[in-house]
């Protein structure tokens, strides 16, 4: 069978992608904050490292907050296999396990427990989480990629 030059290029590109791009086997995150954001993330951990549908995902975060937060908004978007499935906006100080005011200085919490729904499809999820303060200035931004499996 004879392949055109373009087909060979595409096949080679596809093979390179398969070799170079590793699948997500645990939770990976990226600080997407702007340099002027008021919260500087020092540590962000997820347990278990391999999220499982029907179980809790425990999130621990620590960092430095350079101004007091008296109120704010939280924005969350979740994409599954490149399809947007959730977009939420909520009050930072009500219903998120956060009590305002949040004082300026070192900040640490291990109290964020997020249950992964038992019927969550197995696959790759992308989460974008952005917080804004009482002055509508961005506090922080976090991008998370995870592969949720079934138990």
UniProtKB/Swiss-Prot annotation:
One of its GO terms (molecular function) is sterol binding. One of its GO terms (biological process) is sterol transport. Pfam families: E1_DerP2_DerF2. Residues 1-26 form the signal peptide. Keywords: Lipid transport, Signal, Transport. Monomer. Belongs to the NPC2 family. PANTHER family: COUNTIN-3-RELATED, NIEMANN PICK TYPE C2 PROTEIN NPC2-RELATED. Catalyzes the intermembrane transfer of phosphatidylglycerol and phosphatidylinositol. This is Putative phosphatidylglycerol/phosphatidylinositol transfer protein 1.
């Amino acid at each position: 069978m004879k392949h055109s030059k373009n087909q060979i290029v595409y096949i080679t590109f596809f093979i390179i992608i398969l070799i170079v791009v590793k699948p997500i086997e645990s939770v990976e995150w990226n600080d997407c904050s702007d340099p002027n954001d008021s919260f500087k993330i020092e540590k962000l951990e997820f347990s278990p490292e391999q999220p499982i549908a029907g179980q809790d995902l425990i999130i621990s975060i620590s960092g430095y907050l350079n101004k007091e937060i008296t109120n704010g908004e939280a924005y969350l978007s979740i994409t599954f296999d490149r399809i947007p499935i959730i977009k939420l906006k909520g009050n930072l100080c009500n219903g998120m396990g956060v009590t305002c005011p949040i004082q300026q200085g070192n900040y640490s919490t291990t109290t964020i427990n997020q249950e992964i729904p038992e019927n969550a499809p197995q696959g790759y999820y992308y989460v974008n989480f952005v917080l804004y303060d009482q002055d509508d200035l961005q506090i922080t931004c976090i991008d998370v990629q995870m592969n949720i499996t079934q138990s």
